[in-house]
Amino acid sequence: MTISPPEREEKKARVIVDNDPVPTSFERWAKPGHFDRSLARGPKTTTWIWNLHALAHDFDTHTSDLEDISRKIFSAHFGHLAVVMVWLSGMIFHGAKFSNYEAWLSDPLNVKPSAQVVWPIVGQDILNGDVGGGFHGIQITSGLFQVWRGWGITNSFQLYVTAIGGLVLAGLFLFAGWFHYHKRAPKLEWFQNVESMLNHHLQVLLGCGSLGWAGHLIHVSAPTNKLLDAGVALKDIPLPHEFILNKDLLTELYPSFAAGLAPFFTLNWGQYADFLTFKGGLNPVTGGLWMTDIAHHHLAIAVLFIVAGHQYRTNWGIGHSIREILENHKGPFTGEGHKGLYENLTTSWHAQLATNLAFLGSLTIIIAHHMYAMPPYPYLATDYATQLCIFTHHIWIGGFLIVGGAAHAAIFMVRDYDPVVNQNNVLDRVLRHRDAIISHLNWVCIFLGFHSFGLYIHNDTMRALGRPQDLFSDTGIQLQPVFAQWIQNIHALAPGTTAPNALEPVSYVFGGGILAVGGKVAAAPIALGTADFLIHHIHAFTIHVTVLILLKGVLYARSSRLIPDKANLGFRFPCDGPGRGGTCQVSGWDHVFLGLFWMYNSLSIVIFHFSWKMQSDVWGTVDADGTVTHITGGNFAQSAITINGWLRDFLWAQATQVINSYGSALSAYGLLFLGAHFVWAFSLMFLFSGRGYWQELIESIVWAHNKLKVAPAIQPRALSIIQGRAVGVAHYLLGGIATTWAFFHAHILSVG
C-alpha cells in the first residue's frame, strides 16, 4: 500500500468553487452570437447564420480558458439531462393519456401496443389501425409498454405521476445547470481531481444507482410481475407503496421476507434465494429474463461498483493514483508507455470524450445483440416489430457514437495535443509508425473487399449459368463458419461447468430448445451456415473500411507528407489554400464526413442481415404439435448467398407491404418511403455540387432583385464547400434511415 507525502494530498477532495463568477443576463443571451466577437456584430452575409450554428456549442472558440470551458461543459450536461427528462416525460404522458396500456397489460399476446391516436383533419384517421382490445391507434415499436410492465406499472395514473416526476426532475436539472455556472462554479482543480470523480461516479452513480434499482426490482417489479404472470386481475394487484409498507404481501410471494435482515447480517445469504435467483434462460410465460435474476444481477453489480469506488486515493494516503498507474504502465516494446496520457486526459475534454464515445458506441452495439439474445423485458421477444426496431436503433446509435469518438480524437490531435508531453509514449509511437498501420489496414480492406464480394459474384455467376452444385452454399461447396459454430457450442455447454447452479443456459440463441410464448417463437437457437459466413465477411470489409477512414483522419490530423503544417489549418478546412491543387478533403472533419457514409453503409448491411435471418430462421408461429412455421420459410440459407437473392428475396419481396400500403393504416409508411427517398436524392445535389456554380446563379438572381429594387440587406452567399458537405451528409443519412424505417415497419407490422 502506498502512503503519500502530505503536501501532495492537501489539494485532494476539497470542494472548491467560485461564487457568482458569471452574471445571469437575459439581455446578453438575447443577442445572437453574443459568444463570439465577430458574430455579435450581426449578419452581413448569409454565411453568418451557418457560423452561428457551427460555433454556438464549440466552447473552445469562445475562450481559451480551460476552467471556463470545463464549467460550460459541466453546465451543459445538466441542460442535456433536462432535455432527456422532458423527452421521457412526454413519452410517458402519451402512455398515460393516449394509449391502450392497460388493455395490453391484460392481454399482451393479442393486443398490440399503441400510444398515439391521429386526429381526423382531412382523413388522417385512416392511420388509426385496429390494435385489438377495441382500441384504434398507431402501433408503437419503442418497447415502452414492455419496459413499463417490467417496472411494475399497472395503471395509467402511475404513468401520469411518473410523467410529472420527469418534468420536476427536468426543472431541477435546469436549475443545477444554471446554479453551477452562474452561482457556484467549480474551479479547474475540481474537474481535474480524477480520483474523487471516479469515487463519485463508481460508488454513488453506478453503485448506489444499481443498488437503488435492485431495491425497486425486489420490492415492486418482481412481486407485481409475478402476480401479472399468474393472471391476477390488474385491480387485485397491490400498488407499489402497499408492497413496500406491508411486508406480509411480499412474504406471501417470497417467504424469506419474513426473516427480515437477520440472514444478511448472519451471512446466511442463501435464504434469500427465492427472490435473488440464478435460474438462467427466459420466463416461459413472458419470454423475458426472470425478474428475480435481474434483481440479483443489479445487486451484484452494485456491490462491485461500490467496492470499485473505494480503490482510488483521495483524502487518505491509501489507494491507487491514476497518474501513478499510467506512468508505471510500460511494456517491453512501448517506450515510455502510458506516460503523458494523464496530462492528455485531464487537460483535453476532447480526448476524454473520444475514448468515452468509442467505448459507449461499442457497448451500445453489444446491447443491440443482448436485446434479442437475452430479452430483458416481458413480452419483448414475441413483439417482432419492436425487436427489429430496437436492434436497428441501438446499432445505428452505436455507429454514430463511434464516428463521434473519431471526430473528437481528431479535434484533440489538432487543438489539444502537446508533442512535449507525448515523447516516446504509446500515442507518440503510434503516430510515428502511422504509415505502417494505415498501409496494412488498407491492404486488409482491399483483401476483404475483393474476396467477400468475389464469393457473391461467383455465386451469382454459377446461378445464372444454372450450376447449383458449384455454388458456395450449405448444399453445394460448403463454407461453414466453423469458429463461430465452435464459440456457440462452448457457450451452450460452458454454463454447466462455470455456473452449475443455473437451471437453464444463459441464452437460447447458442443452442437448446425453442421457447414459444402464445404460439409465437420467443427464442430459438440461431444456426449459422454458409450464407452467414459470406455476409460476415462483408461486415468485416465494411467495418474495416470505416475504421481505415476514421483512423487515418485521427493519425494524420496534425500533419501528413502532403500537408506538413495541417495542424495550423485547424480541424475543418476545404483545401490547403488556393494554388495547391489536390489538397481538398484532407481535414480531420472531412474524414469524419467520409466515415459517416461508410458507417451507414456497413450498418445497413448489419440490420438487413439481422432482419432477414430472424424472419427466416427464428421468428414465426408454433403449432399445437410443435411444428414451427417461420415468417419467410427459412429462405435465408439459399437466397442470401447471391446478390440477386438479396435484391429479389429481401429488398424487393419485403418491400411489397410498403409499396402496397396506400389506403391502409400503414399508408404513412408508404408516404415516408417515398419522401425519404426524395430526401436522400436531394442530398446528392449538395454532394455533387460546385460552389462556383451556385454563386454565379445567386449573383444573377440578386441582379434581378436589384432591378426591381427589392435587394436584400444581407448579402446571399453560396454554401461553403464544408457547409455543402454537412448538408449533404445530413440529408443522405436522414433519407437513408427514414427509408429503412418505413421499409422495416410496413413489412414487419404486416407479417410479424
Curated annotation (Swiss-Prot):
Residues that coordinate or bind [4Fe-4S] cluster: 575, 584
GO biological process: photosynthesis
Principal location class: membrane
GO molecular function: 4 iron, 4 sulfur cluster binding; chlorophyll binding; electron transfer activity; magnesium ion binding; oxidoreductase activity
Cofactor binding comment, as recorded: PSI electron transfer chain: 5 chlorophyll a, 1 chlorophyll a', 2 phylloquinones and 3 4Fe-4S clusters. PSI core antenna: 90 chlorophyll a, 22 carotenoids, 3 phospholipids and 1 galactolipid. P700 is a chlorophyll a/chlorophyll a' dimer, A0 is one or more chlorophyll a, A1 is one or both phylloquinones and FX is a shared 4Fe-4S iron-sulfur center.
Residue numbers binding phylloquinone: 694
Residues passing through the membrane, by range: 73-96, 159-182, 198-222, 294-312, 349-372, 388-414, 436-458, 533-551, 591-612, 666-688, 726-746
Superkingdom of origin organism: Bacteria
Sequence positions that bind chlorophyll a: 685, 693
Keyword tags: 4Fe-4S, Chlorophyll, Chromophore, Electron transport, Iron, Iron-sulfur, Magnesium, Membrane, Metal-binding, Oxidoreductase, Photosynthesis, Photosystem I, Thylakoid, Transmembrane, Transmembrane helix, Transport
Residue sites binding chlorophyll a' per the record: 677
Catalytic activity: reduced [plastocyanin] + hnu + oxidized [2Fe-2S]-[ferredoxin] = oxidized [plastocyanin] + reduced [2Fe-2S]-[ferredoxin]
Signal peptide positions on this chain: none
Places the protein is found: Cellular thylakoid membrane
EC number: 1.97.1.12
PANTHER family: OUTER MEMBRANE PROTEIN, OMPA-RELATED, PHOTOSYSTEM I P700 CHLOROPHYLL A APOPROTEIN A1-RELATED
Assembly, per entry: The PsaA/B heterodimer binds the P700 chlorophyll special pair and subsequent electron acceptors. PSI consists of a core antenna complex that captures photons, and an electron transfer chain that converts photonic excitation into a charge separation. The cyanobacterial PSI reaction center is composed of one copy each of PsaA,B,C,D,E,F,I,J,K,L,M and X, and forms trimeric complexes.
Protein name, as recorded: Photosystem I P700 chlorophyll a apoprotein A1
Organismal lineage: Bacteria, Bacillati, Cyanobacteriota, Cyanophyceae, Nostocales
Underlying gene: psaA
